[in-house]
Amino acid sequence: MKRLWLFLLAIACSSCAKDHEKPLADLSFISVERKADLSLYIIRYESNINLLDLYGRGMGEGIASAQFICALDGDYDFSVEHEIGRSAYGRIQADAAQANQPTSIFFTEAFLSETLDKGQSRRDLSVEELNALLANKKTIPCKALITAYGYKPYYSNSMQLPVADLLREINKPTAP
């Protein structure tokens, strides 16, 4: 009985989530580079909206999560309830050097990985897997996803990340 009440309370509270009433951000690709010899890629992009201050409370205040996600394999369902099978993903971070500008510059240190066990774990994709996966693509779609307590999820418009730039970094030789 207690579980039923908790379930009903969760449903009631989730239906009360406010619409953020914010326009969808337009993201523009700037660059991508591999971080040292790690399987981590720094993706830089510009937004016409400050993604980390959507609610006017200050940078990062009131936000539960700020994620940047790119679909690597044609799965374009970016919804919170869905795990994209193969993706580039990471936390949205502000470029401190660009503070107080009319547009905002952000970066994400992204892992290129595959989701396993219904979202319970992830595995980094190998260089060979990434080359095969991206071989016939010109761009891949990416979105910012912001969640905040009491609000519906916020999604940006799609940004197209050039695959040629990503493959250049994936295939960079590593230091001996």
Regions found by a protein language model. Give the residues of each.
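Positively charged n-region of N-terminal signal peptides that target proteins for export
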Residues: 1-4
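Sec-dependent N-terminal signal peptides
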Residues: 7-8
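C-terminal motif of bacterial Sec signal peptides marking the signal peptidase cleavage site
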Residues: 12-15
